[in-house]
């Protein structure tokens, strides 16, 4: 019966254990330990129904994102926790607080960005911490505080760490393995590994280290180390893949005897890319520091901030220190700050800071110094003559305090009242909207003034403004004032008080003034209106000028059009038709029986065309023959020839037309001579010849002749038609003259006028002898150009 009850009890306990196992997990009951295995089950969170007596919990290969405090609460017996290969990005603080028995924690291959101070709190017995292949960018200084003395294996490889809590690492005295490879470490504090006597493996591969601190622990990494003990095993040290700066600071590492691990030099330029262990020891050199830039002199008002700069170069980069004038090393404090670039900031200067500050740049190769002179302008303090002592930390003299005290001091106590400042010691003139000129004067009994202090404030905001003025100046222009505002201005004189060895001050005088009012909007509007008015005026002037010019052109055009017809009409008033070669008789004829006068001589001046030499000779021969026939007919006159023409200017259209017109009138006079043989024609010819002169051009003055050749409107044209009379040409060709009368001329049709020939460039269909008659005497049947006057 007892055996049956024992079997039932064991079965019930096994059933209870199996029933407590989470879904998709495997629970193992191995003697006294209980294991819960849930690897790669696709879990999104830690199962809440895990047996709290679990000793080994494996949750790797899932999709857990968040770890909370309830996930591992009351698991005091948990020894091994695996959370590898998840997507954990956040661990709530104190989530492992109850895991006091945990020996191994695997958080590798997750997405942890950092480890806070309380992330790993409570793991007092932790020996193995594996946090590689995460996204760690920083680790808090107190993150490893609870297991510093128990930790044996720390793996932080394949992260983004720029630094570590090196003070915590220094205290991990039981650490056996430290993996820091494939990070962004660029500096290791000196003495970090001094107490890690049990360290057997140190991996610093693929970081940004340029140098390593000369620690004795690295001596155990030599290949010939025979002094290894269980408490001091040989060190496996790897530091390949770092840009080592091969100078004198790594000479100690080069002297170690160890196997070549393909470490290379990253700098300086002459050794870049060379294998570290192949570089000779004499090539590991350094350069002493050189100060390239520093502040020389600095003048600061007491109580204000001061900045001293000092820059130096060297190999390795030198460290810069500052020494105060009292030979005190300046460090970081509430009043001063020293930066890595060599700058010293003094936030509040005192009189003790006056003197020479020394900048010291030092490295492994030596040091260099530079001096900076600092002059402190001390704050003004009340003189002994004022019977007052200024507070130790008082600021510059206040207008409201100093001036009011001096005015009302006579009624307080029985002491002697202070002397009032002289009348009108300070004058303010040339006041504008934003500036004013202050002038002052001091008495001869005043001690030697070291400097003047000008104080002024605005009546609106009561902000006091100070200006320090050299003792040689007795005037100062105050700028940047507010328009239309009242100001209180005081001038103080400062000198050295020999009794107190401090700077004493006394009021020279005060004044009040108001700045002029300014109207920026109105002034802006006025300038805009003025600018627009100027544009309109200039535009109006341009338009008016154009209109006047157009009106002048139109008036001139109209006057020319009205004057031209009248002048042209006057020029053609004596024009008559010569269709038949006869001239109408004038109103009064010559008396009968008067001897016939010779034809008037027509003087062809420079208006004639300059024909070719051949045409001129032909014209002369034709003229001689024509005059010879005239003498045979009983004219009784000598042959009439044109005088030789003077050199003429270049012909133009005006001269061409004038020449043709002169030839036309000359032909008419020749016909009158021929007609004068008859009794009727002789009287008419005598009357006609009495109106012309051989000295006057037939077409009038040149000006009138030029105007007569201008084109006229169609309604004002005087038309005159001419034709060829071939009778005389035929007679001349036969060599005689028909006696006893005048044969009617024969008309020739379809003949081009001379103007048409001159315009169209065509030649007349006649012989050259017919054309040269224009230069000699003309018969009654000679052709005349058709012209429009």
Curated annotation (Swiss-Prot):
UniProt topological domain (Cytoplasmic) ranges: 556-789
Stretches assigned to the LRRNT domain: 21-52
InterPro entries: Cys-rich_flank_reg_C, FN3_dom, FN3_sf, Ig-like_dom, Ig-like_dom_sf, Ig-like_fold, Ig_I-set, Ig_sub
GO cellular component term, pick one: postsynaptic density membrane
Disulfide bridge partners, by residue number: 310-359
Chain intervals with Gly residues compositional bias: 407-416
Membrane topology of this protein: Single-pass type I membrane protein
Signal sequence range: 1-20
Residues annotated as domain Ig-like: 289-375
Subunit structure: Forms heteromeric complexes with LRFN1, LRFN3, LRFN4 and LRFN5. Can form homomeric complexes, but not across cell junctions. Interacts with 2 NMDA receptor subunits GRIN1 and GRIN2A. Interacts with DLG1, DLG2, DLG3 and DLG4.
Protein name: Leucine-rich repeat and fibronectin type-III domain-containing protein 2
Organism: Macaca fascicularis
């Amino acid at each position: 019966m007892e055996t049956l009850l024992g079997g039932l009890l064991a079965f019930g306990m096994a059933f209870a254990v199996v029933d407590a196992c989470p879904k998709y997990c495997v629970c193992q009951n191995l003697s006294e330990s209980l294991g819960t295995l849930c690897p790669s089950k696709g879990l999104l969170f830690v199962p809440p129904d895990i047996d709290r007596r679990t000793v080994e919990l494996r949750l790797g290969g899932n999709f857990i994102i968040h770890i909370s405090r309830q996930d591992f609460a009351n698991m005091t017996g948990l020894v091994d926790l695996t959370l590898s290969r998840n997507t954990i990005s956040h661990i709530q603080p104190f989530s492992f607080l109850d895991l006091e028995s945990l020996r191994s924690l695997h958080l590798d291959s997750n997405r942890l960005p950092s480890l806070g101070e309380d992330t790993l709190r409570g793991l007092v017995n932790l020996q193995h911490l594996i946090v590689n292949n995460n996204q760690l960018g920083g680790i808090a200084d107190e993150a490893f505080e609870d297991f510093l003395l128990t930790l044996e294996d720390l793996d932080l490889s394949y992260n983004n760490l720029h630094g570590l809590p090196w003070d915590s690492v220094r205290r991990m005295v039981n650490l056996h393995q430290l993996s820091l490879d494939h990070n962004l470490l660029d500096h290791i504090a000196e003495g970090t590994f001094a107490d890690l006597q049990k360290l057997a493996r140190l991996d610093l591969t693929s970081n940004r280290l340029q140098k390593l601190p000369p620690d004795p622990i690295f001596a155990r990494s030599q290949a010939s180390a025979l002094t290894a003990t269980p408490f001091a095993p040989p060190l496996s040290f790897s530091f390949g893949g770092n840009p080592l700066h091969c100078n004198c600071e790594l000479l100690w590492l080069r002297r170690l005897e160890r196997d070549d691990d393909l470490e290379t030099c990253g700098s300086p330029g002459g050794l870049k890319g060379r294998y570290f262990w192949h570089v000779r020891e004499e090539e590991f050199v350094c350069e002493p520091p050189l100060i390239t830039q520093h502040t020389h002199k600095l003048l600061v008002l007491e109580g204000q901030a001061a900045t001293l700069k000092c820059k130096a170069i060297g190999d390795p980069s030198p460290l810069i220190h500052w020494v105060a004038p009292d030979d005190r090393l300046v460090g970081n404090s509430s009043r001063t700050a020293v930066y890595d670039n060599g700058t010293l900031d003094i936030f509040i200067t005192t009189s003790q800071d006056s003197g020479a500050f020394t900048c010291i740049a030092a490295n492994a190769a030596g040091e260099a110094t530079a001096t900076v002179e600092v002059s402190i302008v001390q704050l003004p303090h009340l003189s002994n003559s004022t019977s007052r002592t200024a507070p130790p930390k008082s600021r510059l003299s206040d207008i409201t305090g100093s001036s009011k005290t001096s005015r009302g001091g006579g009624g307080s106590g029985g002491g002697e009242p202070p002397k009032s400042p002289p009348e009108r010691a300070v004058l303010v003139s040339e006041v504008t909207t934003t500036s004013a000129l202050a002038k002052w004067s001091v008495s001869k009994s005043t001690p030697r003034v070291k400097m003047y202090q000008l104080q002024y404030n605005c009546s609106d905001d009561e902000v006091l403004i100070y200006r320090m003025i050299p003792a040689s100046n007795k005037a100062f222009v105050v700028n940047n004032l507010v328009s239309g505002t009242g100001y209180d201005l005081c001038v103080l004189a400062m000198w050295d008080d020999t009794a107190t060895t401090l700077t004493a001050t006394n009021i020279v005088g005060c004044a009040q003034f108001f700045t002029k009012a300014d109207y920026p909007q109105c002034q802006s509007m006025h300038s805009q209106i003025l600018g627009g008015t100027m544009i309109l005026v200039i535009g109006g002037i341009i338009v008016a000028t154009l209109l006047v010019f157009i009106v002048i052109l139109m008036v001139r055009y109209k006057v020319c059009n009205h004057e031209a017809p009248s002048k042209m009409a006057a020029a053609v008033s004596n024009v008559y038709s010569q269709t038949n070669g006869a001239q109408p008789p004038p109103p009064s004829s010559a008396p009968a029986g008067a001897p016939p006068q010779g034809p008037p001589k027509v003087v062809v001046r420079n208006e004639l065309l300059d024909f070719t030499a051949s045409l001129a000779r032909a014209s002369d021969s034709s003229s001689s023959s024509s005059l010879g026939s005239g003498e045979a007919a009983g004219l009784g006159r000598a042959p009439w020839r044109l005088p030789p023409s003077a050199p003429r200017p270049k012909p133009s259209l005006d001269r061409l037309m004038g020449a043709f017109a002169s030839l036309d009138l000359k032909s008419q006079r020749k016909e009158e001579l021929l007609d004068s043989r008859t009794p009727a024609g002789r009287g008419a010819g005598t009357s006609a010849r009495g109106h012309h002169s051989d000295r006057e051009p037939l077409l009038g003055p040149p000006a009138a002749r030029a105007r007569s050749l201008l084109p006229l409107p169609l309604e004002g044209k005087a038309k005159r038609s001419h034709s060829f009379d071939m009778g005389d040409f035929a007679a001349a060709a036969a060599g005689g003259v028909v006696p006893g009368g005048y044969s009617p001329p024969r008309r020739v049709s379809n003949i081009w006028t001379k103007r048409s020939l001159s315009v169209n460039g065509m030649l007349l269909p006649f012989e050259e002898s017919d054309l040269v008659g224009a230069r000699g005497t003309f018969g009654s049947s000679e052709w005349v150009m058709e012209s429009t006057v």
